[in-house]
Amino acid sequence: MSGPADAEPVFAEQLGSDDPLERAQAALDLALYYLDRGFAPAGKTRAFLKARDIVGEIGSEDLRSRVAAGTLTDLAGIGPSTGSVISDAVDRRPSRYLADLASATVQDVGSGGGIRSLLRGDLHSHTFWSDGSESVATMARSARALGHEYLAVTDHSARLTVAHGLDEARLSEQLTEIEALNAELAPFRILTGMEVDILEDGRLDLSSEMLSRLDVVVASVHSKLAMDEREMTRRMVMAVADPDVDVLGHCTGRKITGRGRPPSRFDADIVFAACARFDTAVEINCRPERRDPPEELTALALEWGCRVSIDTDAHAPGQLEWQAWGCGFAADMGIDPERIINTYPADELLGWTAAHPTA
């Protein structure tokens, strides 16, 4: 990934459309991109999502008439901010709101510019197949606009019902969709994948037959986070020892924003020794509320010789830019880029995922 990140190519065609409705929707999408990039409060994001739905319902001529008459904000659900973005797009004016939002949400790579230039993709992302906010196609096009060569789509497995996790039938449908999109987007590649739940006994929430069909498997703990340290250690080791698992996701499960959540307790030496033994990468999760693992555990994973993956865990296109933090963190930790698996070209990466040792 080289050069500055730029979201606008994803929306450029619609922003330049002759149809005022398409321009308005693209401008709202761009606002949502920046809001997601800036980890905006959910209420703000919902306001723009609602405005996008409202605009889609009223049609081009009604929209143009309301903007001309200054009555756009008379519509329930259209406020001053959303109204200004829509009106500027309809009238083909530069949007001060979008410009300010873009400036305020730039992601600082810090000392990680060198690592960022070497990254070729992101191995942890979600779409509306589970709890993401956008389609596979939109996430992929956004990743491509950021300079990525590939994006792994890793929606949740069925056990995580709160996130509308995929059972095997729905996952098979998604694989068919990805196959068609790859034909359209080549040479960019959407890698098939899943963030599979590590069950309480260490088993994975997907059959080995289905796991073997996937390009990238991220295994994560989402339940019983406060279980006994010894049992959690056993649970995690069983998962990373599975040759179908490529990445151990957000290993402590901590949350560091809002009400927060303490990290799970496990014997990190044993878990990271297993990651090194079975060549399973430890994820550096870039989500602002996670940023997991912390420095001391990252250092320990490196001491054990683990590979790492710098991933956003993005649930929306703008969140794909959160890799900037992870690159800075990796640089500050002195991580050799050769140990970062998403610096590998796609074919080399897939060769690695297919070659994990067995017990």
Describe these PLM feature segments:
Residues 190-192:
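Short beta-strand elements
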